[in-house]
Amino acid sequence: DKIFTVQIAAVISAKQADTMIGHLKKRGVEGLYIVKGLQRSGGYWYKIRVGHFPSKDEAIAYANRLVDSKLIKNYFVISLPKK
């Protein structure tokens, strides 16, 4: 079984990630979190993700609402193993 999350950005500093999350929280977006991952060239990506959804369709519907509200420009849905 899998769950789905929406990645809305990937930035190269924790400060950028925190700023973006702060802005989105002020606009009412909940369930945001950061995943820190290594870049191939060294350094880190700070991947900003939101939500855990039982289906890909629900994740897409939520992400499309964020796009329609002009809160994000693009996204992609990621499947994760259920814990």
Where is each model-derived feature located?
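Extracytoplasmic
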Residues: 2, 12-83
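Conserved beta3-strand ATP-binding lysine motif
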Residues: 9
